[in-house]
From Swiss-Prot:
Catalysis: reaction(s): AMP + diphosphate = 5-phospho-alpha-D-ribose 1-diphosphate + adenine
Source organism: Xanthomonas oryzae pv. oryzae (strain KACC10331 / KXO85)
Main location (coarse class): cytoplasm
Family, similarity comment: Belongs to the purine/pyrimidine phosphoribosyltransferase family.
Coiled coil regions in record: none
Catalytic activity, EC: 2.4.2.7
NCBIfam families found in the cross-reference section: apt, PRK02304.1-3, PRK02304.1-5
Highest taxon above the source species: Bacteria
Pathway(s) of this molecule: Purine metabolism; AMP biosynthesis via salvage pathway; AMP from adenine: step 1/1
Keyword Cytoplasm: yes
Protein name (database record): Adenine phosphoribosyltransferase
Compartment(s): Cytoplasm
Molecular function via GO: adenine binding; adenine phosphoribosyltransferase activity; AMP binding
Length: 186
């Protein structure tokens, strides 16, 4: 079982300068939205490595079969975490990007709606997975990934995000019985 004492969504142990590396982009992708850009943090090798280590730490003793990484920046974080945790990686993509048979889930965003998909046979039933994304905003994307994993009869052991936007209350849409860790909160 995962020790979720650090899953409350606060920056309890990360360096303060991590949050300084995440910049606000006003009116992106639409007017009225303030986008949290994590790419400056990703571009710094030592900070990226230490942030990944912080994200991975609670899951190190949790048996996992794969990390599900949500497009697009969840791919980067998810694949790196899968390597760190010595497990597989499965992409959760936007529609039309995966060949073969897929399952699709629609969800609401802070600024509209979107859809994500996974391969039908990506993992065997009962596989233990960790869902990873870059930012938890309204919770729609994570909730959709949770729904896809449930449709595939996967065991969701938890979710990890680099950034949680507390004002948007996305955590309230998450499953109460599934741990959710946010490394940084704004």
């Amino acid at each position: 079982m995962t020790d979720c004492s650090r899953c409350a969504g606060t920056n309890a142990s990360g360096p303060n300068h991590w949050s300084e590396r995440i910049r606000d982009i006003v009116d992106f992708p639409k007017p009225g939205i303030v986008f949290k850009d994590i790419t400056p943090l990703l571009s710094d090798g030592p900070d990226f490595a230490s942030a990944l280590d912080e994200m991975a730490q609670p899951w190190r003793t949790t048996p996992l079969d794969a990390v599900l990484g949500i497009e697009a920046l969840g791919f980067i974080l998810g694949a790196a975490l899968a390597r760190e945790l010595r497990t597989g990686f499965v992409p959760v993509r936007k529609p039309g990007k995966l060949p073969g048979r897929t399952l699709i889930r629609e969800y609401a965003l802070e600024y509209g709606t979107d859809r994500i998909e996974m391969h039908e046979g990506a993992l065997p039933r009962g596989a233990r997975v960790l869902i990873v994304d870059d930012v938890l905003a309204t919770g729609g994307t994570l909730r959709a990934a949770l729904g896809l994993a449930a449709q595939l009869e996967l065991e969701i052991v938890g979710a990890a995000v680099l950034v949680e936007l507390l004002a948007l209350q996305g955590r309230q849409k998450w499953a109460d019985d599934v741990p959710l860790l946010a490394t940084l909160s704004f």
